[in-house]
Structures are given as C-alpha cells and as structure tokens.
Amino acid sequence: MSVAFRRESDDEHMEPKFELPIPPGPNWVTARGLRLTRETVAALEAIDTSAMEEEAAKKHKRLLRYWRTRLATAELRPVPGGEAVAFGTRVTYRLNGREKTVVIVGDDEADPNEGRISFTSPLARAIMDAEPGERVDFGGKADAVEIVGVAAVADD
C-alpha cells in the first residue's frame, strides 16, 4: 500500500475496548453470592482512580460497570427445600468411580477449584432435579453420574 493512502494513526494498532461480557440468562445468586457482589462493588467504588494512568482508570471503570450491572440484575434465589438437586444445594455425586461434592451457584460466584459450579454448567444442568440414588446421563454416557447426597446451603 502506498504511504500516501495511510493515516498516521494507522501506525498505532488500537485494540477495541469492549464491555465485559454479561452471561446470558437470569442472574441468579445465593445469599453468599449477593454479599460478595456487594462487597466487590463497594471495594471498587472505594478506589480513587484520579491517580491512575488513563488506561488503568478505564479498565477499573469498565470493571465497576460490570459489577454494578450484576448487582442491579441479581435475583436472590430462596434456599431450596426438599431432596432434589437445585440452585443453592451442595451435591455429592459419583462419576467414573470417584465421589465429588459441588455447590450449585450463580455465574459470578462459580469457582470449580473451590467446588462451586454455575447452574448453567453442563454438569449442573445434567443433575438438576435429580434425587439421591438416581443416575443421570452426562457427557454422552447413560447413567454416568450417580447422586449420592443433596443438602441445602443457606450461606457459605
């Protein structure tokens, strides 16, 4: 391309600045998830951005917008009753001969390393509404997951 057809600003490749993606669907939260979201918003609001470089301040403001949106759209789900797997339950299951325990939580609260999975995750969707002793299909395998136990989680 001829230099005559280039703008000086073409020399700088600027990455587009997008908002942080909001997960589709409802923003269900546990009591713990709502508390953590409020704490995150408060912590971000307490940070003085006036001393930050412009890019750092923009990133901070984008993060704050995300968490304010998540707080505004949060739907606190009631503590589940009954024996079935539901949002806000601690589930012990057996998969491939190994027993594991997870808590089914909202998207922002999910952390598989801590045993917290989102209600939109494939495993949570597969075991939803199952009761102890039931086997459910998962990963293309029939009866792959056996539900061992279910307990409501009030606030962890």
What are these regions (language model features)?
Residues 148-156:
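Short, compositionally biased
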Residues 71-78:
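Short glycine/threonine/proline-enriched tight-turn/helix- or strand-capping micro-motif at secondary-structure
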Residues 1-71:
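Helix-rich terminal scaffold detector
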Residues 78-148:
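Non-DNA-binding regulatory cores of transcription-related proteins
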